[in-house]
Amino acid sequence: AKGMDQWTYVGNRVIHGPNWKVAYDGYLEGYHFKAAHPETIEPRTYSNVMEYDAHGPHLLVGFAAKTMMTLGEVEQNELWQHETRGYDFIRLFFPNVSIFVAPEITQVAQMIPGPGPLENTTITHFLHPKPPENDQNQAERIQMADWLRDVVQEEH
């Protein structure tokens, strides 16, 4: 996102999971939303509607939200201004980094293979485009970082 170098760092979380390629596939498709994330992602995002845009080895994956039809009146050249209000993107940078931008927080994740062949360590970093206004605002951001970690770690 434009100006990301000026964003505020919220913190990081570490997640231990399965083989990194298996875990990375979760960013590539939404078919697992209904089964793996029935309480968090599935209520707002379709499990079977995705769009892929390749940029060399990198991918932009779009997921349609259940509010997508509200974008019908938006001019096509202005749709980019409505991210997270009708659709979400995961930006995948080869070989193992993903970025998810949401109004509440932005997550930058890096999956690192190992220590064994059936394991990975995912380090997630959280950013926000504006500094927190107060302690409560900072606490809400920390809570969102914890929630995003829990979606992956506990809802699998």
Q: Model-flagged regions — what are they?
A:
Residues 1-156:
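C-terminal catalytic domain of Rieske-type non-heme iron oxygenases
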